[in-house]
Amino acid sequence: IDRYKYIDSIPNHIIVNMLDNFMKYSLVATVPSKFSSVMNTAQLEMGLSVGEPGGQTGIGSCLMANNGVVYKSNEVYNIPEYQSVAFPASLNDNDRNTKTDIMRYIINELDYQAYLNSMESMFLFILPTDEALKNYVDPVDYHKNQPTITEFYYDYSPSLTGSRIKCKRYNATKNADGTLTRGTEITNPWKNGSTESDYVTNRLKDILENSIIVQDKSATTSTGKSVWVTKGGCPVILEGTGANIRITTPYRKELADQNSSNSPYELKVREVEGYYNMGQNPDGNGETFIVDMEPVMSASKSVSTLLKELATKDNR
């Protein structure tokens, strides 16, 4: 309510999460004697109890209908979706440059919502905006003379059926400092039986898994510089805390190593509403960092290539 001002202004996908938790399909399983066993969507006990009318806790009263019962609660119960590190992806506004519709869509499309809603785990979630997903360097083309940049975008057409995530692919030119300049659009990128839908799903799954860090509950990001490994196996360096955190990905580190100007190559958290500590929401499952430069991307060189380069330097 504080964010959207009016109930009618809250997006449907947020309201649905609340209804999924509070609407139960079995009356028999939700009678007062079974309150202690009623689960939420994360399969954790909701904590229902019998209270007093006008009290501070528990279910104060009920209304009988011809097809069920309405329980009137004296307190607000936790909703896993609102405590999850994935929840900031649902908090969109009217500025398309700050939207995270693509990641919200792919989280649901690939059934990662339940995984990210787990309250038994702690996560660090590096969430790229739709703007960041316009700058994806395809790792399949790293070794080619002609690298490519993919621009993912959300198709808002009302009459659209099927996937709403589309993409455009561009040839790119590699600059002296290792950065890429976007060139002409590739007019027919789908060959050998591949399709746009398959490509989008494959690459966005890779992006999603490299955005998720499963955090040891005893660990913290407040201990200065630390190295983490994403669910997709990508090492990431985090420095600083909260909204001031600096994120160094393998792709960014490689650019820094190629550039002698010592320019900062970290991914920075978005200045406005770029950091969410979901652990304070309350009892949430981690921290979310929103970035609008690019998603987490791997380096272009393999371990064996790096070892060969080191050996060459040592022999000079």
Model-predicted segments: where are they?
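Mature, structured domains of secreted/extracytosolic soluble proteins
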Residues: 1-316
